[in-house]
Amino acid sequence: MANSFATKYNEEIVPALTKKFNYTSSMQVPKIDKIVLNMGVGDAVANAKNLDEAVEELTLISGQKPMITKAKKSIANFRLREGMSIGAKVTLRGDRMYDFLSKLINVSLPRVRDFRGVSTRSFDGRGNYTLGVKEQLIFPEIDFDKVNRTRGLDIVIVTTAQTDEEARELLTQFGMPFAK
């Protein structure tokens, strides 16, 4: 069965964007390339168990095993050595990407306290959107009782759009709740 967001993209979003931006081919229409979830665990330097918990939570959120990120340089002030494990990241593509986007827009973002929409200023100038989440508890898979501390994560939505305007329109069509 095809994903509802993938179907929505092909049947509704492509024609709407083609009309708005006057594309000559459906291949010119921007699409979401991948979604990257990154969780930096700075306190993993002192306690490696914190990294394991972060990896477990990221696995639950994404449905995919994360890659452990390592320090590129040694920083003495942070008691950090090159090659130490300091975070985890997951790259979602295809159906898992659309599933996650659907869950993010319809379930997780509305659960954020005092939510008034996501910032429109988080585009990078090349059509990619970055979103920071302060606590992982907004995701339905995370059990509140099993969490020993709140961790934030970064969500980067990489699109094939050439401009921020195109990317914003693409995400708006998917239902991303931008702040007015």
Swiss-Prot record:
**Transmembrane spans:** none
Entry keywords, A to Z: Ribonucleoprotein, Ribosomal protein, RNA-binding, rRNA-binding, tRNA-binding
InterPro entries named in the record? Ribosomal_uL5, Ribosomal_uL5_bac-type, Ribosomal_uL5_C, Ribosomal_uL5_CS, Ribosomal_uL5_dom_sf, Ribosomal_uL5_N
* SUPFAM superfamilies noted in UniProt: RL5-like
Which superkingdom does the taxonomy of this entry point to? Bacteria
Molecular-function annotations in GO? rRNA binding; structural constituent of ribosome; tRNA binding
What GO biological process term is on the record, naming one? Answer: translation
**Would you tell me the Gene Ontology cellular component terms?**
ribonucleoprotein complex; ribosome
- UniProt function note: This is one of the proteins that bind and probably mediate the attachment of the 5S RNA into the large ribosomal subunit, where it forms part of the central protuberance. In the 70S ribosome it contacts protein S13 of the 30S subunit (bridge B1b), connecting the 2 subunits; this bridge is implicated in subunit movement. Contacts the P site tRNA; the 5S rRNA and some of its associated proteins might help stabilize positioning of ribosome-bound tRNAs.
Family, per the entry? Belongs to the universal ribosomal protein uL5 family.
Relate the assembly described in the record.
Answer: Part of the 50S ribosomal subunit; part of the 5S rRNA/L5/L18/L25 subcomplex. Contacts the 5S rRNA and the P site tRNA. Forms a bridge to the 30S subunit in the 70S ribosome.
Q: What is this protein called?
A: Large ribosomal subunit protein uL5
Look up and give the organism this protein is from: Lactobacillus delbrueckii subsp. bulgaricus (strain ATCC 11842 / DSM 20081 / BCRC 10696 / JCM 1002 / NBRC 13953 / NCIMB 11778 / NCTC 12712 / WDCM 00102 / Lb 14)
Lineage of the organism? Bacteria, Bacillati, Bacillota, Bacilli, Lactobacillales
